[in-house]
């Protein structure tokens, strides 16, 4: 393969890899996506202690920052004071937490709306 074709082949391979990952995410359940992308930091079982992030059991509809014993950042407390975790707010949060509360501890971002929706739909059913 010539040197001029190698970058193109690499770019095509990378695009195919991204497309395959996107398709796999589209076919995964919200529970699977939660386990893959959220469970390392967040517990989901009722009464489980928080991990790196707060316990997300019953998060939909709960006031933001309402987990006893979890130390939210000052930025989080200021930006989300008086707000509850609606599906819409969770969607914005998962897309880019720093846009919702600049300086918050959470760094995870999910650009894919279908993945965010699947995770949020899963969280709606954890009560």
Residue map of PLM features:
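Short, exposed beta-strand-loop hairpins at the edges of beta-sheets
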Residues: 108-113, 120-126
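N-terminal signal peptide c-region/cleavage motif recognized by signal peptidases
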Residues: 18-21
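Periplasmic/extracellular electron-transfer cofactor-ligation site
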Residues: 26-82, 92-102, 126-127
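Bacterial N-terminal signal peptides that target proteins for export
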Residues: 1-10
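ATP phosphate-binding glycine-rich loop and adjacent ATP-lid/helix-beta elements
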Residues: 86
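Cleavable N-terminal signal peptides
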Residues: 11-13, 23, 28
């Amino acid at each position: 393969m010539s040197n001029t074709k190698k970058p193109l082949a690499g770019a095509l391979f990378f695009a195919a890899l991204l497309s395959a990952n996107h398709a796999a995410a589209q076919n995964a359940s919200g529970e699977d996506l939660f386990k893959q992308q959220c469970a390392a930091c967040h517990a989901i079982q009722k009464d489980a202690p928080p991990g790196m992030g707060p316990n997300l059991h019953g998060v939909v509809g709960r006031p933001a920052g309402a987990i006893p014993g979890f130390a939210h950042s000052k930025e989080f407390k200021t930006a989300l004071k008086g707000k509850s975790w609606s599906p819409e707010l969770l969607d914005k949060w998962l897309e880019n937490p720093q846009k919702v509360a600049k300086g918050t501890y959470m760094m995870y971002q999910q650009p894919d709306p279908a993945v965010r929706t699947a995770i949020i739909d899963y969280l709606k059913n954890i009560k």
